[in-house]
Each structure stands twice: as C-alpha cells, then as structure tokens.
From Swiss-Prot:
It catalyses: D-ribulose 5-phosphate = D-xylulose 5-phosphate. Its cofactor is Fe(2+); Mn(2+); Zn(2+); Co(2+). Signal peptide: none annotated. Keywords: Acetylation, Carbohydrate metabolism, Cobalt, Iron, Isomerase, Manganese, Metal-binding, Zinc. It comes from the Eukaryota. The active site is at D37, D175. Pfam families: Ribul_P_3_epim (PF00834). The gene is RPE. This is Ribulose-phosphate 3-epimerase. Catalyzes the reversible epimerization of D-ribulose 5-phosphate to D-xylulose 5-phosphate. InterPro entries: Aldolase_TIM (IPR013785), Ribul_P_3_epim (IPR026019), Ribul_P_3_epim-like (IPR000056), RibuloseP-bd_barrel (IPR011060). Its EC number is 5.1.3.1.
Length: 228
C-alpha cells in the first residue's frame, strides 16, 4: 500500500524574506513534509531558488523535516548531487525534461534520495507507466507548472485514478490549485500526497487547514480500502 495521507505545504507561497521561519511555522502547524519548487527559467518561465537555499534550510530546520524537491528544470541530471548534498530527501524530476529517465532514477537512488516522477497536464499518464515500479512517487500536476495561484484542473483526476488503479502501492502526489474546495476530488481519485500552497500559507490558522486536508484524504483512502 501507499504510505498514509500526507500534507506538504508549498513554500513558494510563503514570505520568502522569512523562509526559515515560514517553514518552521508550517512544521509546527502539523505539515508532514515541505514541498520545495525549483525553477530554472528554462523548463518553466519563472525562477525560484537552488541548492544553496535548500542547504541553508536544512541547517536551520535540522535533519527531521522531509524535503520534497519538485525540480522544474531543463537539465535535472545536473542537480542530483548538489541537492543530495544540500539535504534533499526526495527528488522529483519531470518526465518531459529528460530522454533517459532510467539513468536519472538510478543516479537519484545512488545519491541517497527517494525518486519522484512528475508529468505536466499535457503529458499522457501512460508515458509514466513504464517507470512506475522504479519510483517512490508520481506527481500529477493539476496546473501548468511555473507559477502559483492557478486554477485547479479537475480534468487531471482520471490520471490520478488510473495510477491508483494500476499501481496501488505508489505514492501519488497532486500539485496545483489544491485546497479545501478541491482536495476531495484529488483524494477520491486516489492521491495520498497533497501539495497545497496559498490555501495553507495564507491562512490565519494553517493547522486547521492542514488537518482538514488530511482528514478528507484519509477518509477517501479508508473508503477505497473498504470498497475493494
């Protein structure tokens, strides 16, 4: 079985001038992991941060928090070792960004990280299937990657459902426009890792939002297990 339902705030939506404090606020509010978006200005139009920031956060936050790296970069092979050294726990690269996923998966594992494989909305989920048994997590984008605050794309849910049906033990993450109004659709489709940005980061009570998201996700997972 996939691991239990986990909620990962997207720190790109935080006050970046106080990034360490914002991460601590999320962890203190019950976040299961931190989702860190790395953008290079090539694979996506925007630019965020790289491994020096990850290294600084690891030093400030200690070894316990789980860093889920979403690598929206055109050369994901280039950043595996730097991210591993910086303290990343999971390295999710885009299928669209490499011609040799197998070698990249091997490199990530050899550098001591878990492997995530992401697909954009326009990429058919079947292209991910040959690699599903070699990875720890599949990331289904529910917005076009590159910018925060976009509208959730409900028509991505069949991808999640297909993955859950075909690969019951796979962690499936959704990212983009996910919050209290949309999480039930993700959970019912089979997602068990929920990335949420502004819905958590901009809430006056992030703990209550995290708990709500987790409860909806857990209830859907329990229902799926009963329906088998």
């Amino acid at each position: 079985m996939a691991s239990g339902c986990k909620i990962g705030p997207s720190i790109l939506n935080s006050d970046l001038a106080n990034l360490g404090a914002e991460c601590l606020r999320m962890l203190d509010s019950g976040a299961d992991y931190l989702h860190l978006d790395v953008m290079d200005g090539h694979f996506v139009p925007n630019i965020t941060f790289g491994h020096p920031v990850v290294e600084s956060l690891r030093k400030q936050l200690g070894q316990d928090p789980f860093f889920d790296m979403h690598m929206m970069v055109s050369k994901p092979e280039q950043w595996v070792k730097p991210m591993a050294v910086a303290g990343a726990n999971q390295y999710a690269f885009h299928l669209e960004a490499t011609e040799n996923p197998g070698a990249l998966i091997k490199d990530i594992r050899e550098n001591g990280m878990k492997v995530g494989l992401a697909i954009k909305p326009g990429t058919s989920v079947e292209y991910l299937a040959p690699w599903a048994n070699q990875i720890d997590m599949a990331l289904v984008m529910t917005v076009e990657p590159g910018f925060g605050g976009q509208k959730f794309m409900e028509d991505m849910m069949p991808k999640v459902h297909w993955l859950r049906t075909q690969f019951p033990s796979l962690d499936i993450e959704v990212d983009g426009g996910v919050g209290p109004d949309t999480v039930h659709k993700c959970a019912e489709a089979g997602a068990n890792m929920i990335v949420s940005g502004s819905a958590i980061m901009r809430s006056e009570d992030p703990r209550s939002v995290i708990n709500l998201l987790r409860n909806v996700c857990s209830e859907a997972a329990q229902k799926r297990s009963l329906d088998r």
